[in-house]
Amino acid sequence: MIVTTSPNIEGKQIIEYKKIVFGEIITGVNFMKDIGAGLRNFFGGRSQGYEDELINAREEAIKEMEQRAQDIGANAVIGVDIDYEVLGADNGMLMVTASGTAVVIEAQDY
């Protein structure tokens, strides 16, 4: 499946626009990662634990969006946008949302 932030796919004709599809992931932040991130904040540097969590959440949101597109017969998603939001009273949750337009593009001629 082709997934792109562009509104079209160069060299491909869009045959059918299906609908907007979403993939949402909400993940909690681990207490041990919080401690490590706090120390790195104090001393400077990057928080690998938070970065890994962010990367995993983004990949899962995109994967969920792709699956929803496939479920309705699409073979591509265009105009993809990814949003991030911190949730919870103590900002201990991260929500990642991937959205785009599910479309059917012309088949490959192999």
Curated annotation (Swiss-Prot):
SUPFAM superfamilies: YbjQ-like
Protein name: UPF0145 protein lse_0194
Protein family membership: Belongs to the UPF0145 family.
InterPro entries attached to this UniProt entry: UPF0145_dom_sf, UPF0145_YbjQ-like
